[in-house]
Design a protein with these regions (language model features):
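N-terminal uDENN/longin-like adaptor modules and analogous extended polar/low-complexity scaffolding regions
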Residues: 2-302, 309
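Amphipathic alpha-helical scaffolding segments
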Residues: 28-32, 119-129, 140-144, 305-318, ...
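A eukaryote-biased sequence property
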Residues: 280, 309, 321, 328-634
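Short amphipathic alpha-helices and their capping/turn residues within compact interaction modules
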Residues: 15, 20, 26, 129, ...
């Protein structure tokens, strides 16, 4: 039996009435973490009050240093370990105090650590029956025997396409199903082979009805085969099975009875004013690296941990835009580790001890799960926009520029409109999010909205650095950066976001972004073209000169020649945002040259297995138009 290194350690802790929490076993070796700290994390406050509690915490966390030269591969070489911990309390009349409390943990590099819950439950039950090290040894062998050799390795762009698609067969050609799935002797001879006409070889057919967003495998433990579904669309900053929707619902106030925030004003957090939505305040705090505590007094530690993990996803744009949040996350921690916590800049931590609420110097933002309120610490430095500062200057310049507009009667009117715009942009975004949740949109759709929001923010920050800080503009065919209806809209956006952009530019995630962006641009298959910008033009601008539209389609054609280019191109057209529909408008353009180029682009995309699925998902109106025009040229 081949052992992989899916799991690094198995831990076992117990609560002793005389000694307190103690670490009893570490297998196969010691973790290197202080045993007292480990046992305290494995047996969280109040766990004995519940029959079962799941906890998540991290090991090997280092104070982040984005300036270090070593490049770390997050999936394979990262020292960060995620710990899935199960605490069980069993009432026993023969035990002192009438109960036995034990905790068993799996330490893994896998972000999808929740897949180990079923086997951990079985192992814990076995350990209560037979409390020996052999139980941990057999568990270690079972989880590391899980076969992932057939699991497809998606590129970043492929993963984003799969993530944004509801098509269960997307990338099906990359899967090799296990021969074990064809072991039915009754009809094996009938269906085990077919002739592939393209190659002339016999092949096994793929199993039908599988959701290719997951890889199916199994863990065999003590003779029991446990089916496992590994999510294939997980991004680097997404850990566990948290819910962003639950985070939003918990901290969204009743609008009809919301008097506005009573928190002290801070320009990084609530630029629009006291009616900033609490979730937007939290997002701004994440972007500007504030110290954040989630307090869940009386709540299971696992529930608190999931709020922390959801916040990490929120701030990172669900792992597609920024990174550096999970390395500063403490999904569950306690007073034993407070010194280590306070050494970490911009930590995001989950606690159940109400003592944290009293120590306002320990945190900048406190999110109380029980009350649904977000509090800004009175000790958070109150930063005023200084005269002549970058953030102040861009705001003043925008106001002065706008005040010269003939449509504005006075500076006062301009200022009022600008402030209203700053409120409206975020308020409209949150209204869209809440409406989607109310309409029962899924978790993936809600995460996608924050992914797009954070992406727009960092692209605006790039423009800010060029316009205000004097950094050189990025060279790109047909321009680079966000799209605005007019110059006034651009200045309003820069003014509204100046303070939090300045805050973000001082953070660890900003430094990582600079490195990652340089690497992405260097390794991109599509060079010298900002695809996102061109698609935004087709979506947002009402009137584009024919010459420019033609140039856009020609640029797309020139950059969708290889398979890798097609995949990268399609990743900019997520299907939950309409897929190819912005490009489909070209099929109806009054200019025959543009219709011709749009048709040529669609025909090229259709030759790709992935692109053909995008074509199938076109609206009926656009699909009929495409098929009719394609039939004429064949």
């Amino acid at each position: 039996m081949t052992l992989n290194k899916h799991v690094e350690y198995i831990l076992l802790a117990e609560f002793d009435i005389d000694k307190g929490a103690s670490l009893k076993h570490q297998h196969p070796t010691e973790t290197g973490t202080d045993e007292h700290i480990l046992s305290e994390l494995m047996l969280p406050d109040g766990a004995h009050l519940r029959a079962e509690d799941w906890t998540i915490f991290c090991l090997n966390q280092l104070t982040p240093d984005p300036d270090q030269q070593q490049i770390v591969d997050e999936e394979h070489k990262s020292p960060l370990l995620y710990v899935l911990n199960l605490v069980r309390t069993k009432h026993d009349a023969t035990a002192r105090r009438g109960a036995r409390v034990k905790a068993m943990a799996i330490c893994t590099r896998h972000q999808y650590l929740h897949i180990y819950k079923p086997v951990l439950l079985l192992a814990m039950e076995r350990y209560f029956e037979n409390p020996t090290i052999e139980i941990l040894e057999s568990l270690y062998e079972a989880v590391n025997s899980m076969d992932l050799s057939r699991m497809p390795k998606f590129t970043w762009h492929e993963r984003q396409i799969l993530r944004a698609s509801d098509n269960r067969t997307m990338f099906e050609e990359m899967f090799m199903d296990s021969p074990e799935e064809y072991d039915d002797p009754v009809d094996d001879e009938v269906r085990k082979k077919f002739i592939d006409l393209s190659s002339g070889h016999t092949k096994r057919p793929r199993m039908l009805g599988k959701d290719r967003h997951f890889f199916e495998t199994k863990i065999e433990y003590e003779g029991i085969k446990l089916p496992i579904k590994i999510p294939l669309t997980v991004n680097p900053e997404e850990v566990g099975d948290f819910s962003v929707i639950k985070l939003i619902n918990t901290f969204t106030p009743n609008i009809n009875h919301y008097p506005g925030s009573l928190n002290p004003h801070h320009p990084h957090l609530d630029t629009p004013g006291s009616y900033t939505h609490p979730i937007m305040l939290l997002l701004n705090a994440l972007l500007t690296q504030k110290r954040i505590i989630f307090l869940g007094h009386g709540h299971p530690s696992g529930e608190v941990a999931n709020y922390v993990l959801a916040a990490c996803a929120l701030g990172s744009g669900c792992g597609t835009v920024l990174r550096g949040f999970t390395e500063r996350a403490f999904p569950y921690t306690n007073l034993t580790s407070v010194d280590d916590l306070l050494k970490c800049p911009g930590f995001i931590a989950g606690v159940t001890n109400p003592t944290y609420e009293e120590h306002t110097s320990w945190w900048d933002i406190l999110c109380n799960i029980s009350t649904g309120k977000i509090t800004v610490s009175k000790d958070l430095e109150y930063v005023r926009g200084r005269k002549g500062s970058i953030a102040s200057s861009v705001k003043e310049e925008a106001i002065v520029s706008l005040s010269r507009s003939p449509s504005m009667n006075s500076y006062k009117d301009t200022n009022a409109q600008e402030e209203k715009k700053m409120v409206d942009t975020d308020a409209e975004f949150m209204q869209g999010v809440l409406s989607a949740i109310g309409a029962h949109y899924g978790e993936t759709s809600i995460r996608a909205k924050f992914q797009d929001y954070v992406l727009k923010f960092v692209r605006l920050a790039d423009l800010y650095e060029q316009e205000v800080c004097g950094l050189p503009a990025k060279e790109s065919t047909l321009g680079y950066g966000p799209v605005f209806a007019d110059e006034g809209a651009k200045k309003r956006e820069l003014a509204a976001n100046a303070n939090r952009i300045e805050g973000w530019r001082q953070t660890i995630s900003y430094k990582y972004y600079q490195k990652d962006q340089a690497s992405r641009m260097e390794n991109s298959c599509i060079q010298d073209l900002d695809v996102y910008r061109q698609i935004s033009k087709l979506k947002k601008l009402k009137q584009i000169p024919d010459d420019e539209v033609l140039a856009i389609y020609e640029a797309f054609l020139n950059n969708t020649i290889t398979h890798r280019q097609v995949i990268e191109f399609l990743s900019y057209l997520p299907q939950h945002q309409g897929g190819l529909s912005p490009l489909g408008v070209g099929l109806f353009h009054s200019n025959p040259l543009i219709r011709e180029k749009a048709l040529e682009l669609f025909r090229r995309l259709e030759r790709s297995p992935v692109g053909s699925k995008f074509i199938q998902d076109l609206s009926k109106f656009q699909k009929i138009a495409y098929e009719r025009q394609a039939a004429k040229v064949e």
